[in-house]
Design a protein with these regions (language model features):
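His/Asp/Glu-rich metal-coordinating catalytic cores
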Residues: 1-155, 159-162, 179
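Acidic, His/Gly-rich catalytic cores of divalent-metal-dependent hydrolytic chemistry
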Residues: 257
Length: 257
């Protein structure tokens, strides 16, 4: 799945940032043609060192790296989820004792709200906005976060229309293509079947003609269809916005917070 998602994300980056990079579609195609797909726990040896990938539990196909050389073991992670999510099982930490660990620390200095509490807050807010005949806009990352938010709402018994837009729809197709990576593929398939897909401007206008929940990239409000929804919904007090993604410094989402 990482192979498919990488191509999708890089192409989207080029589309948004246009001529700001020294590479384009031909270079991407060349990179993909020379790429090798490696499965989890598949040991690769180079010289006197070996490495293998383990599931990070963060996004589908997301990996940590276990490196061994000269009887020493190093464990390297990017984003990692030790508890798992509605979509994915937790990170694979069946790795034994390590000599060194290098890990991300995005929230290491923060006390995060318990997951059940944050999910309940989102569900309650969604119902509150719908009850006052408004639309709830949830800007969200295309990969995993959009799908997770939809799963939280639908699995809670939320019976109102949920719309999904943008690149998240293509990511849905990738996730459905690799059910063996998902925690419960049948539940996820049911969620996607209940979500209303919006693919063009006319469908967006029709979608906003009645109270609903809209899930759309970009998660930090940097471009994407999120800009359209924000402009359409921000001047009506009945509507609401829920920021469920990390907001980087200098982004519109961070300023809104």
């Amino acid at each position: 799945p990482t192979f498919d998602l990488s191509k999708l994300l890089i192409q989207d980056m080029i589309k948004i940032e246009k001529n700001s990079h020294s590479f384009g579609v031909p270079e991407i195609d060349n990179m993909m043609a020379k790429s090798k797909i490696i499965g989890f726990k598949e040991k690769i040896t180079r010289g006197n060192a070996s490495f293998e990938l383990r599931s990070s539990g963060h996004v589908i196909g997301g990996s940590t790296v276990l490196v061994e050389s000269k009887n020493k073991k190093l464990f390297y992670t990017g984003d990692i989820n030790l508890r798992g999510s509605r979509l994915l099982p937790p990170a694979d930490l069946d790795i034994g004792e390590m000599d060194m660990v290098i890990t991300e620390s995005t929230y290491s200095q923060e006390n995060q709200m318990p997951r059940k509490e944050s999910e309940k807050g989102l569900i309650d807010f969604a119902n509150e906005v719908i009850d006052r005949k408004g639309t709830l806009f949830i800007p969200s990352f295309s990969v995993e976060r959009s799908q997770e938010v939809a799963s939280v709402l639908i699995n809670s018994g939320f019976n109102h229309k949920i719309i999904m837009d943008g690149m998240a729809l293509k990511v849905n197709e990738v996730l459905l293509k690799y059910p063996e990576y998902l925690r419960n593929p049948e539940i996820f398939k049911d969620v996607i079947e209940k979500v209303v897909s919006v693919r063009d401007h006319n469908e967006r206008k029709r979608a906003l003609s009645e109270p609903c929940v809209v899930i759309s990239p970009a998660g930090m409000l940097v471009g994407g269809n999120a800009v359209y929804y924000l402009q359409e919904l921000s001047f009506n007090d009945k509507n609401g916005i829920a920021l469920v993604s990390y907001q980087g410094e200098g982004t519109p989402g961070k300023k809104l917070l």
